[in-house]
Amino acid sequence: MTIKRKCGIIKTERRKGLKNLKGVIPLAYKSIIALGRQYGSGGREIGEKLARLMNVPFYDRELIALAAQRSGIAPETYASIDETATNSLLYALSTGAFMFSSHFTSSVDLPLNDKLYILQNKIISDIAEKEGSCVIVGRCADYILRDNPNCVSVFVYAPLEQRIERIKKKDGITADAAESKIVKTDKRRANYYNFYTNREWGSITNYELAISSYPLGSEKTAEMILEYVKYREKVKSE
């Protein structure tokens, strides 16, 4: 097959075996995917693959970098407390101790954990408003964007056995060490989510779509989520 390029357009003398042209042109999506995940389920990888399939921005640890830029605090400092809750934010909220904005004005010195949550809350809201379609992993994005009609809340899970095996291979540790890491990480994420949202992390009633990454694997799971997004957008446009 000979392919010629003319004036920036790819032309072919033989179309057999080529993908449908519609499959080459990126679709313009409206959906914002807020993706929660169990540790070891491959949620981050699935989110990255989904963002590539949709040709939209992907945000996970990138939110830490954005928070650091806005606050002037080192990214390493925020990374060490990311998705970790404290018990002081509700008190500050009840006393009106701070203003919800990109700058903090407070009579109470909020811990960095709470400042990071507030700042990421603002960043996620700004991203949804200004950038539109994207994939956001964790950080209570499903709750923050709960009133946004374009937000699709997704939770990725997998059987414990498969998660243990994944973390074993990824980190080069024993099965016992992998299980311990999974339990601790999931507990930290649950505490963070439950505290800041007053919801139950991982409860399927809090998500529009809950999907197991096993046995499909990350690629097929991302494709399944995308099919749901496509159908959802079609239904909403009718």
Where are these regions (language model features)?
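Pre-Walker A (Motif I) flank of P-loop NTPase domains
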Residues: 29-37, 132
